Design a protein with these regions (language model features):
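Secondary-structure junction motif
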Residues: 104, 175-179, 187-209, 277-286, ...
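A short LG(V/I)-centered, amphipathic sequence patch enriched
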Residues: 40-57
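Hydrophobic hinge/microswitch elements
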Residues: 126-139, 145, 195-254
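Short helix-boundary/capping micro-motifs
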Residues: 10-28
């Protein structure tokens, strides 16, 4: 099996066809076809099939695709590691959840002092988006909540700081003077997580208080959309208390200080267990860890 075969296979899958893959790689279509057929012959399996919408991987092809992406990512990291020796170049890609994004400015500033020429890519999203990108090595690491991720031997988790949930609403909300969850149970709510997600705030807040989870809950997997709904409607939601206090959100959102204790959660760093970070990615990870200590003291 040659690296060029893996490259060609990935190009076909990502482009959706032989012609598009050939154009992307700057080679002829027959060359791509021979390469993929040779790979299939070596693996004794058909990896690709034509459909009305384009070329897609077969079941064996999907299994090989996951490994091929990891192999390509490992090769790219190996090349970067060699380039980085004795130089201050290279690249790092990492993900942050909205809560953990608070420490990015401090972390990047520290990192730039050591690697001013390195390429940095930052992805923001919820854990269900970021964690798969760590698994397939699209991201070097991700900073997000622990509880929403099922145990996985491929991932390592390093706790960084604890955060607290708060009930939030828009300023001037008719329920802003409520002081118990019971007084909010009939309101409309928005959730960034599925209600049955491990460690989610709804069950952990309402059940200990002897209350049922609110019936009117909209699940919204977009952080910006959720913030817009909270700011422009009478919906309620659970957000990080520290995020509300340290960001511009406090200009148009406020906390409802209910009497019941609300759950907290751990934010930490997810990395792959079988792949060491490159020199540059490791330096960024260390900068994030240092920046997180400020949040840990403020929590």
């Amino acid at each position: 099996m040659r690296l060029s075969q893996i490259r060609d296979f990935l190009a076909v899958v990502e482009s959706g066809g032989i012609r598009a893959a050939a154009r992307k790689l700057g080679v002829s279509q027959p060359a791509i076809t021979r390469s993929v057929r040779g790979l299939e012959a070596e693996l004794h399996a058909r990896l690709l099939q034509r459909t009305p919408t384009g070329v897609v991987p077969t079941l064996p092809g999907r299994a090989f695709l996951a490994r091929a992406r990891v192999a390509q990512a490992e090769l790219r990291k190996a090349e970067e590691e060699v380039d980085q020796l004795g130089q201050r170049v290279g690249s790092v890609a990492f993900g942050v959840s909205p809560t953990s994004a608070m420490m990015v400015p401090e972390a990047v500033s520290r990192f730039r002092q050591q690697f001013p020429q390195a390429r940095v890519r930052i992805a923001e999203g919820l854990p269900n988006l970021l964690i798969p990108l760590v698994r397939d090595e699209t991201l070097d690491f991700a900073i997000c909540r622990q509880a929403v991720v099922k145990p996985d031997s491929a991932l390592a988790f390093r706790p960084l700081f604890r955060n607290d949930f708060a009930v939030v609403c828009r300023r001037g909300h008719p329920l802003e003077k409520a002081r118990s969850l019971a007084g909010l149970a009939e309101a409309s709510w928005i959730s960034l997580l599925p209600l049955d997600a491990p460690g989610g705030p709804f069950d952990r807040a309402f059940s200990p208080a002897g209350l049922s989870v609110p019936k009117q809950v909209i699940q919204c997997e977009s952080y910006n959309t959720a913030i817009g709904l909270l700011a422009k409607t009478d919906m309620l939601g659970f957000l990080s208390r520290q995020l509300l206090a340290e960001s511009i959100l406090r200009d148009f959102l406020q906390q409802i200080p209910v009497a019941e204790p609300l759950p907290s959660f751990i934010v930490g760093m997810f990395t792959r267990t079988d792949t060491p970070l490159t020199q540059v990615a490791g330096a960024m990870a260390k900068s994030v860890i240092v920046a997180s200590r400020v949040l840990a003291r403020a929590a």
